[in-house]
Amino acid sequence: MEKFINYTSVVIPIDRSNVDTDAIIPKQFLKSVEKSGFGDNLFDAWRYLDQGEPGEDCSNRPLNSDFILNQRAYREGKVLVARENFGCGSSREHAVWALRDFGIRTVIAGSYADIFFNNCFKNGVLPIILPSADIDALFECNQASGPFSMEIDLDRQTATTDSGQVYRFEMDNFKKKCLLEGLDDIALTMQHEGDISAYEQRRMTEVPWLFQDLSR
């Protein structure tokens, strides 16, 4: 997993509560277990005017010009802001894969569905929780002055707007370490490779019959 590096990006405001995983990546696109290739279908039903199909070239599909991701100022955004209960619905990890594949590295919301929240950390996406008053302020900032940027500093646990407003967020130390060092479940397991090998060797000595090739 790629290490999380502090960065500055335009903010993508999606002023909705209860954005579910089927809205993030519709069910018809869940046929692949690869983590890439989902970005074109992120928010597919909101982003396009037609019904998308798996494997379809999205470059010629009719766009919904009112949707935020189709507006030029927001297309390169890496920070998404929404309201409470983001990522609710089914537990598909593809939802985080789609956000990550599009380029979004941080989501800021009032709250999250638990499974989605934990899936973010396993895929290099930072889910920030802010009080509803702070979320309101971010949407008001966009409404008042248009597109704005934020600096995301995971080391200091701050999100700072280009006008200098600083928002501090809480973060579990272990999850923070995993993001900063790029550690997913496999990488965490491989940190104990020596202990695992030693255990396997010991078991082969203690119960050798468990390791016999029964196909012969």
Describe the residue ranges of each PLM region:
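Cytosolic catalytic domains that perform sulfur/thiol-centered chemistry
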Residues: 1-83, 87-115, 119-216
